[in-house]
A protein has these predicted regions:
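An N-terminally biased module of ancient metal coordination in phosphate/nucleic-acid-related enzymes
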Residues: 1-94, 179-180, 192-275
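Extended substrate/RNA-proximal surfaces in nucleic-acid metabolism proteins
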Residues: 51-228, 284-300
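C-terminal active-site subregion of NodB/CE4 polysaccharide deacetylases
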Residues: 261-267, 272-298
Length: 302
């Protein structure tokens, strides 16, 4: 079993990259893709930690985090960490997310794009802090960074900050009153198009995947048009297995995959406590992404 859509504290998850590796061992995953929003900051940490565990296991050490079935407990598997990212894009006024799998995250052009994107996000976050201060909330961007070290600050971090400092009673309240779309302290971020994201992922040697298309609430014709456009540019996969899909929705996306000769991808979209009903690997409890999905997406070695 694999999970090809996972977030860490480096974006808006609550598990560190290392904790994700430990938890993936507990869940019995053979692999997971770390796909933080618009950042690759957690990849080195997760990949390095997984390799350290493999070396320790080869030297005879046990893995203290393992809690899989008794039959496997003596030799738990350290999961492969797939280098990935989830890029924020916009298409005809809708937020569309593109997952990149197997990316060369050290590729210069890719790294340069992320640096520019992070600077743009920082400017946006400064503006949101200023608007929140106008609403009698004591917040600075420096305070956010201090509270969430190493993270690319998202609206979820704003919400958690407001919650921890007593300005709101729930994360939902933060989005309803302050930082949700069309709320008084919301500032839209600069975005690329889905087509540009596909090209960026391909340029980094990665596999571009359209993430959770059902969540965009597009008409069938409009979604079909988007997929057709992206296929022409080089889209490789589409997320047909996802935590919130029902049977009919999965069938619909599998149909699109078949129509446009796209490979199936799947994942939980695990965020830890920020999405408490969604678990790693199993989503709402019934998610299952077989290893074959990963192997079908894996690029051929050159």
């Amino acid at each position: 079993m694999v999970d090809l859509h996972v977030h860490s504290t480096c974006s808006d998850g609550t598990f560190t990259p290392e904790e994700l590796v430990d938890y993936a061992i507990q869940k019995g995953l053979t692999a997971f893709a770390l796909t933080d929003h618009d950042t690759v900051n957690g990849l080195d940490r997760a990949i390095r930690y997984a390799e350290e565990l493999r070396q320790a296991q080869a030297a005879g050490s046990s893995l203290p985090t393992a809690s899989v079935s008794d039959a496997d407990a003596s030799m738990p598997q350290v999961p492969e960490v797939i280098p990935g990212i989830e890029l924020s894009t916009e298409y005809q006024g809708k937020d569309i997310h593109m997952v990149g799998l197997f990316i060369d995250y050290r590729q210069p052009e890719f790294a340069h794009y992320l640096e520019d994107f992070i600077r743009s996000r920082e400017n946006r976050n400064e503006k949101m802090c200023a608007l929140l201060r106008e609403h009698d909330i004591d917040i600075t961007y420096e305070a956010l960074l201090a509270e969430f070290p190493g993270a690319v600050i998202t609206r979820a971090h704003f919400a958690r900050y407001l919650l921890s400092h007593g300005y709101i009673q729930s994360m939902k309240e933060a989005f309803d009153r302050y930082v949700g779309d069309h709320c008084p302290c919301f500032v839209p971020r600069e975005k690329v198009t889905p087509a540009q994201a596909v090209e960026l992922i391909l340029g980094a040697g990665g596999v571009p995947v359209l993430a959770h298309p059902i969540l965009y609430h597009m008409s069938d014709d409009r979604l079909d048009t988007l997929v057709a456009e992206l296929k022409k540019i080089g889209l490789v996969g589409i997320e047909a297995i996802y935590s919130t899909y029902n049977t009919a929705e999965e069938r619909q996306i599998r149909g699109l995959a078949s129509k446009y000769d796209l490979k199936i991808s799947g994942g939980s979209d695990f965020h830890g406590a920020n999405k408490p009903k969604i678990d790693l690997g199993t989503g709402w409890g019934k998610l299952y992404v077989p290893d074959e999905v990963l192997e079908n997406l894996r690029p051929e070695k050159k």
